[in-house]
């Protein structure tokens, strides 16, 4: 697989994992829509030292429970596998019996690397949105600080060794089971034709051997039948010779 395709697979896999975890997080966020909103309307308003900070409380044990469920791992593996299919990375799957093994390897990779520690580190703090709206004339807002501590999960995953091991392992799995496409599409076609041709040649050899076998059996039976006829004919000839001798 080329470097560009590997990078795309790595990036897409990371996005799928982060989106899947985020979907589980939404079920565990105690305040689904957290937002700080400050509106300044009218004229001549003066605001000093405005500070906004927002954190959504999140039960990490809830997220860990959902992430460790078998359904989550299976669904995540299905999403990754489908994504790889959409990229035509697994182009040879119609010829390759290893599709099931590939999917199993991906699932095992997720189980090993997506640990509760990684999940807890990436979802322990989640922030919403800070909004400051000023409308009107002559309004002054000084020393306004907006602290947004929203942790983008994909960034957390990309910086995590465990997540890197996950995506790297999946990429290696794809490389292993998609060795045809790692060379060249036309090489894949040539290999496919060669494989079919070899199967045809094997079938032809088998047919020839069967025909030769039939000929050998036929020749053996025919020779045996002819030998039996000759043995039956010998007494008749002897009797005829004796009769002729007696008449003489």
Swiss-Prot record:
Keyword vocabulary terms for this entry: Capsid inner membrane protein, Fusion of virus membrane with host cell membrane, Fusion of virus membrane with host membrane, Host membrane, Lipoprotein, Membrane, Myristate, Signal-anchor, Transmembrane, Transmembrane helix, Viral penetration into host cytoplasm, Virion, Virus entry into host cell
Q: Where are the transmembrane segments?
A: 200-220
UniProt topological domain (Extracellular) ranges: 221-248
The topology of this chain with respect to the membrane is: Single-pass type II membrane protein
Question: What range does the record give for the signal peptide?
Answer: none
The main location is host cell
Subcellular location(s): the record lists:
Host membrane; Virion membrane
Q: Which residues lie on this side of the membrane: Cytoplasmic?
A: 2-199
Please verify whether the record's keywords include Heme.
no
Among InterPro entries, the record links this protein to: Virion_mem_poxvirus_L1
Specify one Pfam family.
L1R_F9L
Quick one: a GO cellular component term? viral inner membrane
The record's comment on protein family reads:
Belongs to the asfivirus E248R family.
Assembly and interaction partners: Interacts with A151R.
User: What does it do?
Assistant: Essential for viral fusion with host endosomal membrane and core release.
Q: What is this protein called?
A: Inner membrane protein pE248R
Q: Which organism is it from?
A: African swine fever virus (strain Badajoz 1971 Vero-adapted)
């Amino acid at each position: 697989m080329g470097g560009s395709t590997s990078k795309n697979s790595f990036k897409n896999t990371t996005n799928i994992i982060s989106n899947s975890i985020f979907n589980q997080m939404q079920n565990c966020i105690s305040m689904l829509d957290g937002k700080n909103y400050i509106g300044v309307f009218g004229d001549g308003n003066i605001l000093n030292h405005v500070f906004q900070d927002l954190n959504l409380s999140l039960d990490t044990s809830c997220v860990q429970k959902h992430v460790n469920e078998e359904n989550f791992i299976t669904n995540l593996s299905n999403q990754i596998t489908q994504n790889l299919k959409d990229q035509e990375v697994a182009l040879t799957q119609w010829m390759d019996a290893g599709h099931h093994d590939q999917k199993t390897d991906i699932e095992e990779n997720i189980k090993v690397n997506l640990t509760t520690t990684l999940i807890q580190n990436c979802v322990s703090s989640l922030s919403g949105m800070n909004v400051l709206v000023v409308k009107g004339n002559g309004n002054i807002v000084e020393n306004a600080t907006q602290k947004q501590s929203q942790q983008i999960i994909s960034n957390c995953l990309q910086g995590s060794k465990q997540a890197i091991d996950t995506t790297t392992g999946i990429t290696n799995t794809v490389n292993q089971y998609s060795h045809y496409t790692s060379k060249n599409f036309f090489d894949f076609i040539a290999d496919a034709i060669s494989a079919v041709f070899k199967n045809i040649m094997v079938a032809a050899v088998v047919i020839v051997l069967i025909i030769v076998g039939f000929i050998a059996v036929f020749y053996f039976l025919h020779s045996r039948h002819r030998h039996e006829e000759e043995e039956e004919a010998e007494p008749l000839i002897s009797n005829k010779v004796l009769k002729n001798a007696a008449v003489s």
